[in-house]
């Protein structure tokens, strides 16, 4: 789903394996779609998702995805080795985080220089067009077809994030089922305002 807030990031990811240094940082706030885009790249590149305790030698010659680098800090030495392996034939490294690499903490000077030189692509919070597409997708997954007034109401009221869109669709579906009502602007208002109790 392309929109002005993610088109540059999508193009940057699509440029793999031609990334400078065979590595890229995908940066954006929570709920901006980093995980969705990273997983799409992971599948397209047949990458390995890095987890603590993995044997680094098993990752040689493979593209590697490391998510939330700035929140669940990987060992400096492991990250440095992943950078080195990214340059090998068949390798590649995608790192996701909320903060840019220049703000990541490290005590290893060689890793600091790699982070400072890392190509970065940025995601913004979803705009109306992207959030609309996301809402449509989540409603479609539940076989729900709300009217235009529901979309317009939700776009004015919900937090600008993909998890928030998923959660409001879930809550509306549960409320409609519990109350034996169709999904309408009135139901959306009741759910968002908290005036409708889902469970007694």
Please describe what each predicted stretch is.
Residues 58-97:
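Conserved nucleotide-sensing/catalytic segment adjacent to the nucleotide-binding pocket
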Residues 118-130:
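Conserved AAA+ ATPase "SRH/arginine-finger" region at the nucleotide-binding site
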Residues 21-37:
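Walker A/P-loop nucleotide-binding motif
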Residues 101-116:
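Short regulatory helix/loop adjacent to the ATP-binding pocket of P-loop NTPases
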Residues 14-21, 58:
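Phosphate-binding P-loop
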Residues 152-156, 163-177:
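C-terminal helical "lid" of AAA+/P-loop NTPase domains
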Residues 42-53, 60:
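Post-Walker A helix-loop "phosphate-sensing" segment adjacent to the P-loop in P-loop NTPases
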Residues 1-7:
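Dynamic helix-loop-helix/coil hinge segments at AAA+ ATPase domain boundaries and subdomain interfaces
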């Amino acid at each position: 789903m392309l929109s002005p807030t993610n088109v540059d990031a999508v193009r940057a990811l699509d440029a793999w394996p031609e990334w400078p240094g065979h590595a890229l940082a995908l940066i954006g706030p929570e709920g901006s779609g980093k995980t969705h885009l990273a997983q799409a790249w992971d599948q397209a590149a047949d990458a390995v998702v890095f987890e603590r305790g993995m044997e680094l030698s098993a990752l040689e010659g493979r593209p590697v995805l490391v998510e939330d680098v700035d929140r669940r800090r990987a060992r400096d030495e492991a990250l440095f080795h992943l950078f080195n392996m990214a340059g090998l034939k068949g390798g590649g490294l995608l790192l996701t985080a909320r903060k840019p690499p220049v703000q990541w903490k490290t005590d290893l000077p060689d890793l600091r220089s790699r982070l400072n030189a890392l190509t970065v692509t940025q995601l913004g919070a979803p705009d109306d067009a992207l959030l609309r597409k996301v809402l449509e997708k989540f409603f479609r997954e539940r076989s729900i077809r709300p009217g235009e007034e529901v979309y317009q109401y939700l776009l004015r009221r919900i937090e600008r994030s993909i998890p928030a869109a998923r959660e409001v669709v879930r809550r509306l579906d549960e409320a409609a089922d519990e109350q034996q009502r169709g999904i309408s602007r009135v139901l959306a208002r009741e759910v968002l305002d908290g005036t409708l109790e889902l469970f007694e």
